């Protein structure tokens, strides 16, 4: 599996939405994190599971990460897409769906397998896969819509009430 890039980020916290209220949970704000982005070389849930297992072993051996997903030390947010034969011949990819907030390798494997089947079903029924963020419902063993990546209101963007100018 080829690695496209590795970069450092800082966790900013997370938004919690309950009814008509939104809250910001800053418990993880400022926590450094390393993001590893791979090329589209993984073609199945089993390949993803094997890659993550080797990656975690490498990170642990290097002493840079404990690899404990259940403690939030390692996260995986797979981008999954299915393409038609015509798209493959043109060198194109299908529309990607990102699955967020997975807390175990088993959840990664299960969510990828489910999402692949879901997308194939959509395409075979004549529909189009939408670019969205999905979550994983462990109890129902299925992905669930979190938000569309196309609607600004889904990102809770608001107008600032005051702004300062820098000179």
Question: Over which residues does each language-model region extend?
Answer:
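Basic, nucleic-acid-interacting segments
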Residues: 1-163
């Amino acid at each position: 599996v080829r690695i496209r890039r590795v970069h450092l980020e800082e966790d900013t916290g997370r938004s919690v939405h309950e009814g008509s209220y939104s809250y910001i949970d800053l418990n993880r704000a400022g926590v450094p994190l390393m993001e590893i982005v791979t090329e589209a070389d993984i073609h199945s849930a089993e390949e993803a599971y094997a890659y993550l297992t080797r990656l975690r072993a490498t990170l642990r051996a290097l002493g840079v990460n404990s690899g404990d997903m259940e403690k939030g030390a390692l996260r995986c947010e797979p981008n999954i897409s299915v393409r038609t034969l015509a798209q493959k011949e043109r060198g194109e990819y299908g529309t990607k769906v990102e699955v967020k907030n997975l807390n175990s390798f088993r959840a990664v494997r299960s969510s990828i397998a489910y999402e692949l089947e879901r997308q194939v079903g959509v395409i075979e029924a004549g529909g189009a896969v939408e670019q969205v963020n999905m979550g994983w419902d462990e109890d129902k063993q299925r992905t669930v819509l979190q938000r569309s990546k196309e609607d600004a209101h889904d990102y809770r963007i608001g107008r600032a009430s005051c702004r300062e100018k820098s000179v």
